[in-house]
């Protein structure tokens, strides 16, 4: 029997232990996609308490708490910070088998150094007190934690109308060495069926100083804002393709679709597909021209609980996995981009693990000469961001492509404590390769496999995104 969460956690072969401790453990973090608030980094935010840094805004924890029968007031409601933390602590022992149990205790270990206590109802007060004491120290501010965790690059998620002033503040401070760059997330300009689409287009036009009445105007406004993002170091875009669609249309048709929508009309299913396709094709050309990486997050079924959506809004833990068809529309979209000026570097993520092999084989259709791993099958995302999910994703990538060219892990998180997910990923990666060696499926060549692990942990991403650190 192995003790829980030792220095060799998940490393069940000698080769895995060598890979992790000699090649993976000390690698810096290149967190190319996250949802950290840039304002907190700019002001070097000092967290009020453990709830503020750990539970606030964490829909993973809220889902577990609701499943445990916890009242909503202790998740998103009016209970005090200490009461909410207590409700979480009471839930934690019930999360064994869920990645939250591992994440929770990895996060207590790093950066707080708590290795002697498991979180529960009876230990909550002790952990609350110890962590709050540390959070008052300079090394536990937003920037302090990023420094402790050796984070070299962070890609935030930003709307085209954002002024990016916080990124300017960060970039102007030479004492802070972590690169914090915006990522372009234009979903609100793309989701023509959304209730607030027309209102958003007015805001976009105002910020870009473009009167948007035709499709070409929308493209011009987006170009203006992409120039603004590029001036702030942006090299990455991200799209939530909850359902992948494809439909072709000429300019006159697109103008009509947009005009009717801005006049209060409701677009039909075909019109939505035509409009979204046109936006993605235009943006794909721009990304290619600018040398940006595009990311497609595919397959979320959002806002399933109408009463809770109306009460609390989006992104509060009522989303799940979609099962809409992916292969044909995605193939047509990527092929059209290839024909329409060339396909830029692309990372595809799927929320439904049913689609792993779809994406794993799809990327092989569009790889590019002179660019190793131009098309990427992204790391296990959201509900797949756990041991089995990451093992499946990496195994299928290895079987269908080149694991050695994988750009590795990202937190996709709103929490400054989530950097231990990189550690979790690295341990799982080393466990998997170590088992291959133990079973005679890979050579016991520590230099070869150690270099591969090092590349996946950091160097591949650094090269792929071409961001100077």
Swiss-Prot record:
Keywords: Isomerase
EC numbers, comma separated: 5.3.1.12
Domain of life: Bacteria
Keyword Isomerase: yes
GO biological process per UniProt: D-galacturonate catabolic process; D-glucuronate catabolic process
Reactions accelerated catalytically: D-glucuronate = D-fructuronate; aldehydo-D-galacturonate = keto-D-tagaturonate
GO molecular function terms noted in the UniProt entry: glucuronate isomerase activity
Pathway recorded for this protein: Carbohydrate metabolism; pentose and glucuronate interconversion
InterPro entries registered for this protein in UniProt: Metal_Hydrolase, Uronate_isomerase
Protein's UniProt keywords contain Nucleotide-binding: no
Pfam families: UxaC
Coiled-coil intervals: none
Family, as annotated: Belongs to the metallo-dependent hydrolases superfamily. Uronate isomerase family.
Protein name: Uronate isomerase
Organism (species): Edwardsiella ictaluri (strain 93-146)
Gene: uxaC
